UniProtKB/Swiss-Prot annotation:
Organism: Lactobacillus delbrueckii subsp. bulgaricus (strain ATCC BAA-365 / Lb-18)
Ranges of residues in domain UvrD-like helicase ATP-binding: 3-477
Protein name: ATP-dependent helicase/nuclease subunit A
GO biological process, any: double-strand break repair via homologous recombination
SUPFAM superfamilies in the record: P-loop containing nucleoside triphosphate hydrolases (SSF52540), Restriction endonuclease-like (SSF52980)
Designated gene of the protein: addA
One GO term describing the cellular component: DNA helicase complex
Residues annotated for ATP binding in this entry: 24-31
Length: 1227
C-alpha cells in the first residue's frame, strides 16, 4: 500500500535545486522521508547511488538506512517491467554496500585514504580506537612538552610556561593546569581552524580602552545581559507598586522602602544605559539596597507575600551582579584582564606544542585517532594546493547531492567540512534534524549551527534555500503530545533554546490510534510528598523505586490495554512494553536489585559507571594510601572495607586518640597500645608498609595483582551480589595498568591521576554487563541511550535530582567553544581571594545557559519516547515553610503570559524546576483533580492526571513465599547453599537473638544522625554521601577535605540556608565591637570562598543582625574570649538514653557532635543553639512550644557533654529562633 505523505513531507521529498533544511520534530517520520527522497532521486532522476553522500550520526543509523534503501530497491525491481530500468536497479543494488552512507568519521577516512598524498602522511596507518591508549599517548605527549619547557634555554619561553602553571598553583585541584590543556584539546579538535581559535583565546582580555565599560566584551555581551536582567526586575517592581494603594494606611508603611529601592535601581539602570564609568556604575549598584522589614499584615497578606518575593529577587540579583561583574574596581579589572591575556596566550602556546607533540607520537606509531580523521580530511579539502584542488574537484563532481541526518548534532569542524564538499553556486545540500533533540554538547555538538540556518532559510528572500517544518507526530497518543506541548510551550523560546516552540515547535497529533479502543488516555504525574527528600544528588532512593514498581504492578494487574501495531489489535500491556528513563546510569545496579526484590523483571541497558563501583573505590583508595598514607578518606575507605573489616566503633576509638592530627597519625599512635584492636592496626600498618616498599621496585600491574592475592579481594567481591561482574571490573583495572606501563609510564601517583582524569571524562572501562536478552522485561536506560527509540509506556525518573553543571562553571577556569574564562588568586602578591576576570564572569553565565538549554532538550527527548502512555515520576521535596498546595501555587505564578521568564529558567536546578510551573499552572487553570494510585482505571477521560502515591496504601507487592521458594529452583549447588543460609538468617532475625536492636544501629553516632529522635526537620536534607555503596557502613567516608556542596549551588534548600546562617554567626567578630558588621562578615566569607554568592544573597541578614545586637549577645562584645562557637564534643551513652524502644544491651554508643555556642559566665555556662525553623506568626506561642519539645533532647545531650568535660556547670539552655526573632529558654 502506498504511503501517504503530508504536504510538508512531500515537499521535502520532491524539492530540487535548493539547499533544504528540514526541522523534523520527534516522531515525524524523518527517516522514512530521507529514504523516500533517495529512492525518488534514483528512480526519477536516475542518480547513481554512488553519486549520493549520506551522512548519519551513528553506524547503526547508517546500517539501518542502507538496509531500508536496499529493501525499497528490491521491491521496485520486482515490480519493474522495463529491462533497461531493471538493469539500472540491479547496478544500484550491487553498489549499495560501497555507497557512502556512513558516519562523518567513515567518510573522512575515505578522504584520507584516497588523498593522503595531499598532506604527506604515510598511507599505511591504522586507527587507534582504544580510549586508554589514546589517553596514555596524550599523557606522554604532555609530559614531553612539560619537560621540554622546563629544560628550555630560552628563559622567556620557560617563564611563560611557569606562569601558566603558577596561575593554578593555589587551586584546590593540583592538576588544574594540566586539566586545562587536556580540556582545550577537546574543544580545539572540534574547530575548523584550531590554531587560529587557540590564538584568539587572549582576545577578550586585551582591552583597547581605559575603562572596561568601553570594551567590546562589555558592550556586546555583558551590558545587554545586565539591561535585560534589570529590566525584568524593574517590571516586577513597577507591577507591584501599581498594585499597592499607597494612599491607604495599610500600604503606606511599605512605600518608603520600595520607592527608595526603585529610585536607586533607576539610577543604576540609567548609568548602565549611558555608559557611565565603571566605578560610577559600581557605586550606584552597591547603593541598591532594600532597607526595612516587610512584616506580615493579615489584611493584605497576599500583597506582603508578593512584596517579599520581589524584594528577595531584587536583593539576590543586585548581589549576584555585583559579585560577578563589579566586585573589582576598574583598576583591579585591568590588572586581572592583563594577567588573563598573559595566561591565555601562554595556554594557547603550550596547547599548540602539546598538539604538535601528540601528532608526532601518533605519526611515529603510524596511527590516527578519530579527531585526526576529521582534522586531516578538512585539511585535505581546504588547503591552497593543487592536490587539495584535485580532492575538492573529485568530491564536488562526484556527489550530486549531500544529505546530512541529525544535523543538529554536528560541530563547527564537521559543518565546515560539509560546506567544502559543495561546489560554489550549486544548491545540493539536504539537512534534516531537530534542534529540540540536540543533546550532545559534551561531544562539542553546536545546535547554534542549526538555529542559524533555521533562521536564515526561513526568510522569504533566501534564494536557493528553503526551510520545511515537520510538525506531525506519528508516534505518540494525543495525551502524550498534549503534555509535551503544555510543558515546552512555556519553556523553549527564541532566547532559551533558539526556537519559539509555541509558534514553530508544537507537536501535531497524527498517530491515528483507533478512537474506539479503550487505550490509556492520560499522561500521569506520579508523585509522593516527602519532607525529607533530598534533591542534591543523582541517586534514586527506595521511595522513588517503590512508587514506580507499585505503578508498574498495577498496570500489569489491570491488564492495561495497548495497541499492538503488529496485529492491529489491542492487548494487555506486558513488562516488555515498558521503559524507564533516567538522567544517568549511576543507580542502575541499585535499581536492578530493587526490581529483583519485588519480582519485576528488568533489563539494564547500561552498566553502572565503572569508577564508581564499590570494588574500584576500594582498590583505588588502597593505591592512594600506598602512594601517600596521609589521606584520611581513602585510608578509612580501605580500613572499613571487607578486606580489613574495621567497624565504625573501631574507627571512632582510633580517632579519639588524637583528633587534631591526620587519621594515619592517629592510627600509628593507637597501634602502640596493648589491645586486640591495636594488634589489628599493627597488622594493617605492616601490610601497608610492605606494599609501599614493593611499589618502589615493581610495576603498577604487579602491585595490583599482589594486592588482589594478599587480600583475597578477588574472592571477596566474587562472593558479593553481581560478583562475576565485579571480578571482571578488577581484572580490567589490572589490564589498564599494564597498558599504562607499556606506554612508558611507571609512576604510581601519575597513574592515580590518569585514572582520575578518565573518570572525570567519563571514559568507562567496565566490562559488558552479564545479562540475557531483554525478553519480556522492563527496560532501564539513560535518556541519551533512548534517543531514536520508542516504547508503548515510558516512565521518566529522577526529576527531583539536581543537575551537576556546577563543575563546568566553577574553579579556576571556564571553557567553552566561545572562549576561555580565567579567575586568579588576587591580589597577585598576597592571594587573599579568588577574583573573576570579566571574561570569566560572562562565560560562566553563557555556559550555564547552554548547559540548561541542553537539559531542557534532554527532557524533550525523554518525554517524546512514549507512544501510548507517559508517566512522570517525582519525589517532591516540601520546603519547611509550605505544603504541596502552597508549592504548586508558587510554581504556577512563575508562568507569565504562558511562559517562564529567562530569569526563572536560569535559576533551574533540577528537571522538576522545568516541568513543575507548567504542570501546576495547567492544574490550576483546568481545575484538574488528583487521584490515588488505587483509584486509577483504564480508559479514563482527559489528557493529564496527577496521581498521588501513598507509601502506606500503595505499597509495592513483594513476591509471596511460594514465589520466593520457586525462585531457588534453578540455582547452582553453591547458590542454593547461600539461599538456605539466607533463610536461616531470616528466621534467626525473627527469633531470640538478644541484641537484635543493636544490630540495627552502630556503636558510633553523630548528633546529626540521631536528631530524628528529637524531630530535627532538616536531618535528611543535610545527609550526603559521595561513596554511595559505602554510605550505610561508614560515617568517616564523607569527603571532609572538600568544599561543602552549598558553595557551588545556585538554588538552595532550607537546610543549606540554616548551615550558612550558622557559618556567619560562627565567624562574626565580636572582638571588633561593631554591631553593624554582619554585611562585612558575609562579604568576607564570600571572598574567601567559604560561602557562595547565591546563599549570601538569600540569607536573612535582618535576623542575623537582630541576634548580634540583642541583649542576649551583649556580654559577647565585652568578653569575647569567653564565647565558644562550633565546639566539638564526644560522649559515651547507653543506647536506651537515645532510643526508648531499645532492648537491654550491655554495650555503649559513642555520640559526637558540634555545639553551636556557649558562654562561660562567672558562675556557670549559658548554652545556646541556633534554629532557622519557620514559625507561623499566627500561632507563634504554640509553634515555639513545639520547637522547645522538639529540641529539648538535643540540648540535654549538649548539656551532658559540657558537664562531663570538667567545665563549669550548665546554668541555662536557650534556643535562638532566628525566623521569629525570639530567644527561649529550654528546661
Amino acid at each position: 500500500m502506498a504511503v501517504k505523505y503530508t504536504p510538508d513531507q512531500a515537499r521535502a521529498i520532491e524539492s530540487r535545486g535548493q539547499d533544504l533544511l528540514v526541522s523534523a520534530s520527534a516522531g515525524s517520520g524523518k527517516t522514512s522521508v530521507l529514504v523516500e527522497r533517495v529512492i525518488r532521486e534514483i528512480m526519477d532522476d536516475h542518480l547513481e547511488v554512488n553519486q549520493l553522500l549520506v551522512i548519519t550520526f551513528t553506524r547503526a543509523a547508517a546500517s539501518e538506512m542502507k538496509q531500508r534503501i536496499k529493501q525499497r530497491l528490491q521491491d521496485r525491481l520486482q515490480e519493474e517491467t522495463d529491462a533497461s530500468q531493471a538493469d539500472f536497479l540491479r547496478r544500484q543494488l550491487a553498489e549499495i554496500d560501497t555507497a557512502i552512507i556512513s558516519t562523518i568519521d567513515s567518510f573522512c577516512l575515505d578522504v584520507i585514504r584516497r588523498f593522503y598524498f595531499a598532506i604527506d602522511i604515510d598511507p599505511d596507518f591504522s586507527i587507534l580506537t582504544d580510549a586508554t591508549q589514546i589517553e596514555l599517548l596524550k599523557e606522554r605527549a604532555l609530559r614531553d612538552v612539560e619537560n621540554g619547557y622546563l629544560q628550555n634555554e630560552d628563559q622567556a619561553k620557560k617563564d611563560r610556561f611557569l606562569a601558566l602553571y603558577d596561575a593554578f598553583a593555589g587551586d584546590s585541584n593540583a592538576n588544574s593546569a594540566r586539566d586545562l590543556l587536556f580540556d582545550l584539546y577537546q574543544f580545539a579538535m572540534a574547530r575548523p581552524n584550531y590554531r587560529a581559535w587557540l590564538q584568539k583565546l587572549a582576545a577578550p582580555y586585551q582591552l583597547e580602552t581605559s575603562d572596561v565599560v568601553d570594551s567590546t566584551l562589555w558592550q556586546e555581551k555583558i551590558k545587554p545581559y545586565l539591561e535585560e536582567e534589570f529590566s525584568n526586575l524593574a517590571d516586577k517592581l513597577t507591577a507591584l507598586m501599581a498594585e499597592a494603594d499607597f494612599d491607604h494606611e495599610k500600604f503606606a508603611k511599605y512605600q518608603p522602602a520600595f520607592t527608595a529601592f526603585a529610585t536607586s535601581l533607576a539610577s543604576y539602570r540609567e548609568s548602565l544605559a549611558t555608559d557611565d564609568p565603571f566605578d560610577r556604575q559600581r557605586e550606584l549598584l552597591a547603593a541598591c539596597q532594600f532597607d526595612g522589614t516587610l512584616r506580615t499584615n493579615k489584611e493584605i497578606a497576599d500583597f506582603v507575600e508578593e512584596a517579599k518575593e520581589v524584594k528577595e529577587a531584587g536583593k539576590q540579583l543586585v548581589f549576584n551582579v555585583y559579585t560577578s561583574f563589579y566586585a573589582s574596581s576598574n583598576a583591579d579589572q585591568h590588572a586581572l584582564l592583563a594577567k588573563g591575556a598573559e595566561i591565555a596566550s601562554a595556554a594557547a602556546e603550550v596547547e599548540l606544542a602539546f598538539i604538535d607533540r601528540f601528532n608526532e607520537l601518533k605519526r611515529a606509531d603510524r596511527v590516527l585517532d578519530f579527531s585526526d580523521m576529521e582534522q586531516l580530511a578538512y585539511e585535505i579539502l581546504t588547503q591552497d594546493s593543487s592536490n587539495s584542488d584535485l580532492a575538492r574537484a573529485y568530491y564536488q563532481s562526484r556527489f550530486k547531492e549531500i544529505m546530512v541526518d541529525e544535523y543538529q548534532d554536528t560541530n563547527a569542524l564537521q559543518d565546515g567540512l560539509i560546506q567544502r564538499l559543495k561546489k560554489a553556486g550549486k544548491n545540493n545540500l539536504f539537512m534534516v534534524g531537530d534542534v529540540k533533540q540536540s543533546i550532545y554538547g559534551f561531544r562539542q555538538a553546536e545546535p547554534s549551527l542549526f538555529i542559524a540556518k533555521y533562521d536564515e532559510y526561513g526568510q522569504e528572500n533566501s534564494a536557493g534555500k528553503q526551510r520545511i517544518i515537520f510538525a506531525e507526530n506519528f508516534r505518540s497518543s494525543q495525551p502524550v503530545t498534549q503534555a509535551v506541548n503544555l510543558i515546552f510551550d512555556s519553556l523553549l523560546t527564541k532566547d532559551f533554546g533558539g526556537i519559539d516552540y509555541q509558534k514553530e515547535g508544537q507537536l501535531k497529533f497524527a498517530a491515528g490510534y483507533d478512537p474506539e479502543a479503550a487505550l490509556p488516555t492520560e499522561t500521569e504525574v506520579l508523585y509522593q510528598e516527602d519532607s525529607s527528600a533530598t534533591d542534591d544528588d543523582g541517586e534514586l532512593n527506595q521511595g522513588d523505586l517503590a512508587m514506580v514498581i507499585s505503578r508498574i504492578q498495577k498496570l500489569i494487574a489491570d491488564q492495561t490495554p495497548i495497541f499492538d501495531p503488529k496485529t492491529g489489535q489491542t492487548r494487555p500491556v506486558s513488562y516488555g512494553d515498558i521503559a524507564i528513563l533516567t538522567r544517568s546510569k549511576t543507580s542502575n545496579l541499585d535499581i536492578k536489585q530493587e526490581f529483583d526484590r519485588y519480582g519485576v523483571p528488568l533489563f539494564v541497558m547500561d552498566v553502572q559507571n565503572y569508577f564508581q563501583t564499590f570494588e574500584l573505590t576500594v582498590i583505588m583508595s588502597y593505591l592512594k594510601i600506598i602512594d601517600n598514607p596521609d589521606q584520611d578518606i581513602p585510608l578509612v575507605a580501605v580500613l572499613r572495607s571487607p578486606i580489613f573489616n574495621f567497624s565504625s566503633s573501631d574507627l571512632a576509638e582510633i580517632r579519639l586518640v588524637n583528633k587534631s592530627v591526620s587519621f594515619y597519625a592517629a592510627l600509628r599512635t593507637y597501634a602502640k597500645k596493648d589491645t586486640d584492636l591495636a594488634a589489628r592496626c599493627r597488622d594493617f600498618l605492616a601490610q601497608l608498609q610492605d606494599l609501599r616498599d614493593f611499589s618502589l621496585s615493581h610495576r603498577i600491574s604487579e602491585l595490583l595483582w599482589t594486592i588482589y592475592e594478599r587480600t583475597s579481594f578477588l574472592e571477596i567481591v566474587t562472593a558479593m551480589t553481581n560478583g562475576q561482574q565485579r571480578r571482571l571490573n578488577l581484572t580490567a583495572l589490572y589490564e589498564r595498568a599494564s597498558a599504562y606501563e607499556s606506554s612508558g609510564f611507571k609512576d604510581l601517583y601519575q597513574f592515580i591521576n590518569f585514572i582520575a582524569r578518565m573518570r572525570k571524562n567519563q571514559k568507562d572501562l567496565a566490562q559488558p554487563i552479564l545479562s540475557e536478552n531483554a525478553g519480556n522485561s522492563v527496560k532501564l536506560m539513560t535518556i541519551h541511550a533512548s534517543k531514536g527509540l520508542e516504547f508503548p509506556v515510558v516512565f521518566v525518573l529522577g526529576l527531583e535530582h539536581r543537575y551537576n553543571y556546577q563543575q563546568d562553571i566553577t574553579g579556576s577556569y571556564v571553557l567553552d567553544a566561545s572562549g576561555l574564562g580565567l579567575s586568579f588568586a588576587y591580589p597577585f602578591d598576597e592571594a587573599e581571594y579568588r577574583a573573576d576576570t570579566l571574561a570569566n564572569a560572562w562565560l560562566k553565565i553563557a555556559k550555564k545557559k547552554k548547559l540548561l538549554e541542553e537539559e531542557a532538550r534532554l527532557l524533550y527527548v525523554a518525554l517524546t519516547r512514549a507512544k501510548q502512555k507517559l508517566i512522570l515520576a517525582a519525589n517532591i521535596k516540601l520546603p519547611a515553610r509550605t505544603d504541596l498546595a502552597g508549592l504548586e501555587e508558587k510554581w504556577a505564578k512563575e508562568i507569565s503570559a504562558g511562559r517562564l521568564t529567562l530569569l526563572d529558567k536560569m535559576k533551574v536546578a533540577k528537571p522538576l524546576d522545568f516541568l513543575a510551573p507548567a504542570l501546576a499552572r495547567a492544574k490550576q487553570v483546568k481545575r484538574l483533580g488528583e487521584k490515588a494510585v488505587s483509584d486509577l482505571a483504564t480508559g479514563q477521560e482527559g489528557s493529564l492526571v496527577f496521581v498521588h502515591f501513598d507509601p502506606k496504601k500503595d505499597q509495592a507487592q513483594l513476591p509471596d513465599s511460594e514465589a520466593v521458594a520457586a525462585s531457588g529452583a534453578d540455582l547452582t549447588e553453591d547458590e542454593a547453599a547461600v539461599f538456605k543460609q539466607a533463610e536461616k538468617l531470616y528466621t534467626f532475625s525473627q527469633g531470640g537473638y538478644p541484641y537484635l536492636d543493636a544490630s540495627r544501629t552502630t556503636a558510633y553516632q553523630a548528633v546529626s544522625e540521631i536528631k530524628k529522635v528529637f524531630g530535627d526537620p532538616i536531618e535528611d536534607e543535610l545527609a550526603d554521601s559521595h561513596i554511595s555503596e559505602l554510605q550505610s557502613a561508614n560515617r568517616y567516608l564523607q569527603p571532609i577535605d572538600t568544599e561543602p556542596d552549598f558553595l557551588f549551588q545556585n538554588t538552595v534548600s532550607s537546610a543549606e540556608l540554616g548551615t550558612a546562617s550558622h557559618l556567619v554567626l560562627q565567624y562574626y567578630d565580636y572582638a571588633k565591637g561593631d554591631k553593624d558588621a554582619i554585611d562585612s562578615c558575609i562579604a568576607g566569607l564570600v571572598e574567601k570562598g567559604r560561602l557562595s554568592q547565591t546563599l549570601a544573597s538569600m540569607l536573612d541578614r535582618e535576623a542575623l543582625s537582630w541576634f548580634v545586637k540583642s541583649d542576649f549577645a551583649k556580654d559577647f562584645y565585652q568578653q569575647p574570649d569567653r564565647l565558644h562557637r562550633e565546639e566539638n564534643f564526644a560522649t559515651i551513652l547507653s543506647p536506651k538514653t537515645l532510643f526508648k524502644d531499645f532492648s537491654d544491651f550491655p554495650g555503649k554508643i559513642l555520640v559526637h557532635g558540634t555545639i553551636d555556642g556557649y558562654y562561660e559566665a562567672e558562675n556557670g555556662i549559658i548554652l545556646f543553639d541556633y534554629k532557622t525553623d519557620h514559625v507561623n506568626p499566627r500561632k507563634q506561642d504554640e509553634a515555639i512550644q513545639k520547637l522547645k519539645e522538639k529540641y529539648q533532647g538535643q540540648l540535654r545531650l549538649y548539656e551532658r557533654a559540657l558537664n562531663e568535660s570538667g567545665r563549669l556547670p550548665v546554668l541555662k539552655k536557650y534556643l535562638v529562633l532566628l525566623s521569629c526573632r525570639e530567644i527561649v529558654e529550654v528546661d
